């Protein structure tokens, strides 16, 4: 699930790679940190949904999208976020939301409240970053790591 049109290309590539359907959240942003889900494009009823995004700051868009998916009878809602900034009130929003599990990377050092959340799992990308740095140092291809 793409939580907004800005992530559609990445979400489509992931959906193709894992052979699943794509849905898009059509949202309206009234001002910074305030968004409203206008429509869901695609079928989500009785499906396990995975929200894909590059960054999550206050979790407003993410939790609104999760609520909209559940209101359309999604079976479950997971989120994969590359960079979990998770500024206040993100943790509180996530804990109160219908998100079953949120996966973030350790690209940003997680605070204790993030580490202690039952809904958030941290996936280490340290080995990948280390390998990329090593390849750059040795003038080897980095793009093959992501093929």
Regions found by a protein language model. Give the residues of each.
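PRPP-associated nucleotide enzymes
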Residues: 1-147
């Amino acid at each position: 699930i793409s939580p907004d049109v800005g992530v559609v290309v990445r979400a489509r590539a992931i959906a193709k790679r894992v052979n699943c359907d794509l849905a898009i959240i059509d949202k309206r942003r009234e001002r910074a940190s305030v968004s409203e889900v206008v429509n869901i494009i695609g079928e989500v009823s009785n499906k396990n949904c995975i929200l894909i995004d590059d960054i999550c700051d206050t979790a407003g868009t993410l939790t609104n999208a999760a609520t909209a998916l559940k209101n359309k009878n999604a079976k479950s809602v997971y989120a994969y976020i590359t960079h979990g900034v998770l500024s206040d009130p993100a943790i509180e929003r996530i804990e109160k939301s219908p998100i079953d599990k949120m996966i973030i990377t350790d690209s940003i050092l997680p605070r204790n409240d993030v580490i202690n959340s039952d809904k958030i799992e941290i996936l280490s990308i340290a080995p990948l970053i280390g390998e990329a740095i090593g390849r750059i140092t040795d003038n080897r291809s980095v793009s093959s790591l992501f093929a």
